[in-house]
């Protein structure tokens, strides 16, 4: 399963079938230590992000007499120091713009909620991905640690004016235009998959915003090791977002039937 990153300087890229991995496929790891985040319900320390890549992975293990034992790492924060500040909003408006005919379009980012698999399949069709069984798509979404989406919501300007006055806001159309998801062990590591943006909305920086918001949400949950896979032509795109190829000589590897 490959990624389709979209940025203002990149065109649509099409991934090969999910069961094929070309030789120009790269593993990237998030390593930008200055990436801005808002702290969530726990106080995060920068030591974990400054550690070598494998140090945080090995932090919960210790070797003793040729055996590996699981040990409990020290708590990163005392109970009395815990913050109650909430995590990033589950849903917020990323872009709002006025269109012709008195319409207003909002691009809404969400790090939660459900996705209609038929909408996702339609989005995959638009970017040229091969179709995958709907049952497997639903299972992939269900088993993901986090699913981030971009929706376009179209409404009339009169609806916006009435909502400001306290009346109910009537949404005329809501369309899935972007998605990215992450799998995780819920403690140390996360991998980002399936980054895609509707071709009609490419070239506007929405893919960059989608990845940045997803990374922030993962960091807020104290997930420090974030990786993804990218085709060679979009490695620079992810490196500009703080990802690093082959940190400390570590390479991602794949197994697939001959």
Curated annotation (Swiss-Prot):
UniProt PTM: S-sulfhydrated and activated by hydrogen sulfide H(2)S to promote melatonin accumulation and subsequent melatonin-dependent stomotal closure to combat osmotic stress. Autoacetylated.
Keywords for the protein's UniProt record, in alphabetical order: Acyltransferase, Chloroplast, Host-virus interaction, Melatonin biosynthesis, Plastid, Stress response, Transferase, Transit peptide
Protein name, as recorded: GCN5-related N-acetyltransferase 2, chloroplastic
UniProt subcellular location: Plastid, Chloroplast
Thermal activity characteristics from the UniProt entry: Optimum temperature is 45 degrees Celsius.
Quaternary state and interactors: Oligomer. Interacts with begomoviruses NSP but not with CP. This interaction may allow NSP to recruit NSI monomers to acetylate viral genome-bound CP and thus regulate nuclear export of viral genome by NSP.
EC number(s) per entry: 2.3.1.255, 2.3.1.48, 2.3.1.87
Reactions it catalyzes: 5-methoxytryptamine + acetyl-CoA = melatonin + CoA + H(+); L-lysyl-[histone] + acetyl-CoA = N(6)-acetyl-L-lysyl-[histone] + CoA + H(+); L-lysyl-[protein] + acetyl-CoA = N(6)-acetyl-L-lysyl-[protein] + CoA + H(+); serotonin + acetyl-CoA = N-acetylserotonin + CoA + H(+)
GO CC terms of this entry: chloroplast; nucleus
